Structures are given as structure tokens and as C-alpha cells.
UniProtKB/Swiss-Prot annotation:
Residues 3-69 form the J domain. PANTHER family: DNAJ HEAT SHOCK PROTEIN FAMILY (HSP40) MEMBER B8, DNAJ HOMOLOG SUBFAMILY B MEMBER 2. Interacts with histone deacetylases HDAC4, HDAC6, and SIRT2, HDAC activity is required for antiaggregation. This is DnaJ homolog subfamily B member 8. It comes from the Eukaryota. The gene is DNAJB8.
Length: 232
């Protein structure tokens, strides 16, 4: 039986945050919907990753697992009350999909609903959870995460009207991640309508800024590609 720490790729001394980050990364990688050409293997790995997270993310279950090991845990089981050992009765793991959606704030991160949720997280816990999950899940895009944070700041600023929209396309028939995100922010600055659009696809970030419908600047991975000088 696989070692749950090895399944998540973490040390036995891993912190709860390390466990969460590992789960985000592996669950997104092996979700069956992201692996249509390798669904059977993906389902097995996704289930195992879910099992590992379910045990190691719970301090009591993790402590018992550390003492008994994976084989004993699976053979024994979970407690019906907090006063019994989880090895008293047969343990049934939760549905991997339920854990996955719960982890991402009750939403499917591959759906439009996830991306259309409010991003002004400072006013509510749910948005903050999405931002945290998103940050760790796509930590390989630092420029994108910086952009994501700036969107939160815009949403909480006063004296401007800001709207957000975003789209995600999951799945890939090739070896690439197939991840694409489009986020746009519109606000009024000194009487001018300024729209900032950020597009992240295949590890590259493109930022377009329009003022009153006119394209003003374009940057790719932080490097300026186009800039219109105001002739006024």
C-alpha cells in the first residue's frame, strides 16, 4: 500500500499548509476531467491523492496514521464518534469529488461558475478561500498571481466602478496544461473608462490596457510590446 506522504510528495514533518499545497497541485493535475485520454489511471491517482489528503489534513487521523501506518488505517477504519479509535470500525473514505469541490469553496474549478464568483475576498470568507486555493494551485504563474491580487485591491477601492469577468478552459488533447484564464477590470479614472484585461495561457501572461475603448498598452510577461502615447 502506498505511503500517503509519498503520494502527496511531502515529508512526514510536512506542515498543514504543505499538505494543502500538495493536494491542490496533484488534484488539479490528476482530476479525471483534465485527463480524458488517460481517464482510468487519472481516476486511480486522483482517488489516492484524495485519500491521502483526507487522512493527513485531519490532525487526529494523521496522528493515528503515523502510529499505525497506511495498511492498518485502511483495514481498521474511521470513528463514528470522537471518543472512539478510527480503527474500531470499517472506515469509508469520502467521495474524491466531494473533497475536491469542498476544497475549492464548493465550486468546480474547471467550470465557469468558479471563475464568475466575486473576487472581493476581503469582505467574505468564501472569496478568500478561492484566492488561497487559486494561488497555491497555480503558483507556477507568479506574474498572474500578482495580477490576481491587484484585482482584489481594485474591488475594494473607493470612488471607482469596477467589474470583473473571467473564463477558464480546462482539458488538453496534447501534453500541455490547456489552462487559460481571462480576467478583466473596468473602472473610471478621472472621467476616463479604463479597462485592464489579463490573459494567462500556457504559462504566459498578456496584459492589455484600454482607455475609452482605445488600446493604450500591451505587455507580455511583464515586457512592454505596445504603448500608445497620448498626443493631447
Amino acid at each position: 500500500m502506498a505511503n500517503y506522504y509519498e503520494v502527496l510528495g511531502v515529508q512526514a514533518s510536512a506542515s498543514p499548509e504543505d499538505i494543502k499545497k500538495a493536494y491542490r497541485k496533484l488534484a488539479l493535475r490528476w482530476h479525471p476531467d483534465k485527463n480524458p485520454d488517460n481517464k482510468e489511471e487519472a481516476e486511480k491517482k486522483f482517488k489516492l491523492v484524495s485519500e491521502a489528503y483526507e487522512v493527513l489534513s485531519d490532525s487526529k487521523k494523521r496522528s493515528l496514521y503515523d502510529r499505525a501506518g497506511c495498511d492498518s488505517w485502511r483495514a481498521g477504519g474511521g470513528a463514528s464518534t470522537p471518543y472512539h479509535s478510527p480503527f474500531d470500525t470499517g472506515y469509508t473514505f469520502r467521495n474524491p469529488e466531494d473533497i475536491f469541490r469542498e476544497f475549492f469553496g464548493g465550486l468546480d474549478p474547471f467550470s465557469f461558475e468558479f471563475w464568475d464568483s466575486p473576487f472581493n475576498s476581503d469582505r467574505g470568507g468564501r472569496g478568500h478561500g478561492l484566492r488561497g486555493a487559486f494561488s497555491a494551485g497555480f503558483g507556477e504563474f507568479p506574474a498572474f498571481m500578482e495580477a490576481f491580487s491587484s484585482f482584489n485591491m481594485l474591488g475594494c477601492s473607493g470612488g471607482s466602478h469596477t467589474t470583473f469577468s473571467s473564463t477558464s478552459f480546462g482539458g488538453s488533447s496534447s501534453g500541455s496544461s490547456g489552462f487559460k484564464s481571462v480576467m478583466s477590470s473596468t473602472e473610471m479614472i478621472n472621467g476616463h473608462k479604463v479597462t485592464t484585461k489579463r490573459i494567462v495561457e500556457n504559462g504566459q501572461e498578456r496584459v492589455e490596457v484600454e482607455e475609452d475603448g482605445q488600446l493604450k498598452s500591451v505587455t507580455v510577461n511583464g515586457k512592454e510590446q505596445l504603448k500608445w502615447m497620448d498626443s493631447k
